[in-house]
Curated annotation (Swiss-Prot):
Cofactors: pyridoxal 5'-phosphate
Top-rank taxon, per record: Bacteria
Protein name stated in the entry: Phosphoserine aminotransferase
Protein residues bound to pyridoxal 5'-phosphate: G76, R77, W102, T153, D174, Q197, N239, T240
Gene that this polypeptide is encoded by: serC
GO cellular component, one term: cytoplasm
PANTHER family referenced in this protein's UniProt entry, alphabetically: PHOSPHOSERINE AMINOTRANSFERASE (PTHR43247:SF1)
Record PTM N6-(pyridoxal phosphate)lysine, positions in chain: K198
Catalytic activity reported: O-phospho-L-serine + 2-oxoglutarate = 3-phosphooxypyruvate + L-glutamate; 4-(phosphooxy)-L-threonine + 2-oxoglutarate = (R)-3-hydroxy-2-oxo-4-phosphooxybutanoate + L-glutamate
Function: Catalyzes the reversible conversion of 3-phosphohydroxypyruvate to phosphoserine and of 3-hydroxy-2-oxo-4-phosphonooxybutanoate to phosphohydroxythreonine.
Principal subcellular localisation of the protein: cytoplasm
NCBIfam families: PRK05355.1, serC_1
Length: 362
């Protein structure tokens, strides 16, 4: 079978080595005669999987000991509700930074539980979309926390700054699309959450990193499966967890360690992004409308100068083994999601195709 590179924004490409291991365990896990999908989450075998996965995740991000790691259901959208339900405490408002589609979605959900102070950080610089620096975010004095999304997958916009608002400001962030792609100072955040389906593993699992002093504040109406304290007290097994997604994510963590960890992935991700943006910037045939200071390294949207060629581009790229390049319906065009599992070889195949496509159709 010819090589295929999956540029989907999520569920996303998984490392080939991980899929091979999972294939072996799918029918007979560790010689037990049962599938890894069938073992009990209460059994010692899965408990070992869970403990190793958490420790490897902690190692990869150097997570301080005063932070809890939770393996949850519900995806990022579930956390849009969980954040205010767990962190508001006796306050009624929180700061929400709007820099794109997913930040706006979090704001919409938060309005059910509090009065968000919306900080519109979207700006235009020389005709390109950008985000105000954090120094220009007008935080309010009575906010329980400030929430933002460091990477907007649809818009291709990234906020790479590290928060430095002071120790009394609780920062909550949606790292679904950038977790484990670059070094991260966890200590600057109160809550970090990430849906697994982009840089961690398959869909169905959400990982939450929460500072332990923020536990015990959940609203009385908070569903138990979203209550950080309940989840922590039950080792993320208050109900049956998504065991297969947890197991597969654990394999990805071990794979990441074998690649050299987050620092090594950061270098590769930079190389991939520079290669792809380089082809776009050196051409009048392709364009990207995000300022270089806020370009995403994980999700690269681009448009063709002649949109009438979009259908042809997608058909020919798919035939060439370059899949899932259609842009989100909100912005159109193309989008290449190049998460950790996408090898440099895959991005090189895409850029070679783009150059050839321009030669033939430009």
């Amino acid at each position: 079978m010819a090589q295929v590179f999956n540029f989907s924004s999520g569920p996303a490409m998984l490392p080939a080595e991980v899929l091979k291991l999972a294939q072996q365990d799918l029918r007979d896990w560790h010689g037990l005669g049962t599938s890894v999908m069938e073992i009990s989450h209460r059994g010692k075998e899965f408990i070992q999987v869970a403990e190793e996965a958490e420790q490897d995740f902690r190692d990869l991000l150097s997570i301080p000991s005063n932070y809890k790691v939770l393996f949850c259901h519900g995806g990022g959208r579930g956390q849009f509700a969980a954040i205010p339900l767990n962190i508001l405490g006796d306050k009624t408002s929180a700061d929400y930074v709007d820099a794109g589609y997913w930040a706006a979605s979090a704001i919409k959900e938060a309005k059910k539980y509090c009065s968000p102070n919306v900080i519109d950080a979207k700006v235009t610089v020389d005709g390109l979309r950008a985000v105000k620096p954090m120094s220009e975010w007008q935080l309010s004095d009575n906010a329980a926390y400030v929430h933002y999304c460091p990477n907007e997958t649809i818009d291709g916009i990234a906020i790479d700054e590290t928060p430095n608002f002071g120790s009394d400001v609780v920062v909550a962030a949606d790292f679904s699309s950038t977790i484990l792609s670059a070094p991260l100072d966890v200590s600057r955040y109160g809550v970090i959450y990430a849906g697994a389906q982009k840089n961690i593993g398959p869909a169905g699992l959400t990982i939450v990193i929460v500072r332990e002093d923020l536990l015990g504040k959940a609203n009385i109406a908070c569903p138990s499966i979203l209550d950080y304290t309940v989840l922590n007290d039950n080792d993320s097994m208050f109900n049956t967890p998504p065991t297969f997604a947890w197991y597969l994510s654990g394999l990805v963590f071990k794979w990441l360690k074998a690649q050299g960890g987050v620092a090594a992935m950061n270098k590769i991700n930079q190389q991939k992004a520079e290669l792809l943006y380089g082809v776009i910037d050196n051409s009048d045939f392709y364009r990207n409308d995000v300022a270089k200071s806020n370009r995403s390294r994980m999700n690269v949207p681009f448009q063709l100068a002649d949109s009438a060629l979009d259908k042809v581009f997608l058909e020919e790229s798919f035939a060439a083994g370059l899949h899932a390049l259609k842009g989100h319906r909100v912005v159109g065009g193309m989008r290449a999601s190049i998460y950790n599992a996408m090898p440099l070889e895959g991005v090189k195949a895409l850029t070679d195709f783009m150059v050839d496509f321009e030669r033939r159709h430009g």
